[in-house]
Design a protein with these regions (language model features):
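S-adenosyl-L-methionine-dependent methyltransferase catalytic core, i.e., the SAM/SAH-binding region
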Residues: 1-218
Length: 218
């Protein structure tokens, strides 16, 4: 925008996460439905992919991303199992990973647990949390007074970040304050959040976890 001499905007709308096109691709490793190479790069020009995480990260690093990016309480056990498995040979395909994790998949919840693991890997590969925070931090100076920001989130990790930024103007649990001790909160929420209706979820199951949060620049 700076190239086109656009310094401020009336609003920003962001639909976060992975596109249906990426989930439906049988060659990128985004989905648990296909047996494919574990890639997960949104930017295919990047040399860093999910295979590198699975085969090169330490047990502690793996545990951290599964805990931080997937809320998996047994992240340490999952990490240890992956490290043990890769000692027998590199983990390259989704079918391998799914089999390695089979002992952590209670009947009826297999897809839910696998989806969380894949989510954590994808977030780490694409540095999604860092990118989201970078965007949010630019908004106070980018959006005009009275302008609107709206974000659709699809999982609790990114939703917590957006919610906290709208509430506090930062990513901490308390608002940032200026030198006089006055809270500096650049946005005011317009509503709590909007979730999809049962009718919408029925017609588009991928919308089931979506939340829309919106705020006005003050």
């Amino acid at each position: 925008m700076k190239y086109n001499n656009i310094l401020n905007v009336d609003g920003v709308f962001a639909d976060l996460g992975v596109s249906s096109h990426q989930f439906d691709s049988s060659k990128r490793g985004f989905s648990i439905r296909f047996d494919s190479e574990i890639d997960m790069r949104m930017n295919t020009n990047s040399s860093f992919d999910a295979k590198e995480i699975l085969n090169e990260y330490s047990e502690n690093q793996l545990s951290n991303i599964f805990f931080e990016y997937a809320d998996l309480r047994n992240s340490k056990d999952i990490a240890k199992t992956i490290v043990d498995a890769r000692s027998l040979g590199k983990i390259k395909r989704t079918s391998q990973l799914n089999e390695i994790l089979s002992s952590f998949l209670p009947k009826g919840f297999e897809n839910k647990i696998l989806a969380k693991v894949y989510q954590a890997l994808r977030i780490e590969v694409n540095q999604e949390i860092e990118a989201l925070k970078e965007v949010l931090l630019q908004l106070p100076s980018l959006v005009k007074k009275g302008g609107t920001i709206s974000f659709i989130t699809y999982h609790s990790i990114e939703d917590r970040i957006v919610k906290r930024f709208i509430q506090n103007g930062c990513f901490n649990s308390e608002p940032s304050k200026n030198e006089f001790g006055v809270s500096e909160i650049p946005f005011k929420k317009t509503f709590k959040f909007i979730a999809p209706s049962l009718k919408e979820v029925k017609s588009n199951n991928r919308a089931r976890s979506a939340k829309l949060r919106s705020a006005i620049k003050i």
